[in-house]
């Protein structure tokens, strides 16, 4: 399929409006509006540390066993999707995975779709897509719908995120899994 070269920013919903206003006033007054030293509500509560190789290996093993994981690392994210820093992770091949997450974890409607994270080098192995989609904003066909029921929406599509070494620890976790 031929697709247009289109860039969609990760904050294409209402949260992007406030960023636009802040940037407008920053330029208007030619000064920084906020101190960029950290997130004011959490920075003092959390001692930053990176996942160790052991943590990544153990997390990958738990995912392989079918456990649902809360993954919290790195900087916070903006936009409508969790992108590997504040994410709920689960195997994509669990038959009732969508139902489990929607009813027991997220407490939302049964029909809500899920995204998937895939290494950029492997995206065309699983989806009708080539190239980057780092923010889960493009809908594409899942190539093997039967093998990945947890990420396949009722219409056979998914909104995957391509992951690169730019998100080093999440990238390592996917490789280990």
Regions found by a protein language model. Give the residues of each.
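Flexible beta->alpha loop and helix N-cap segments adjacent to enzyme active/binding sites
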Residues: 1-177
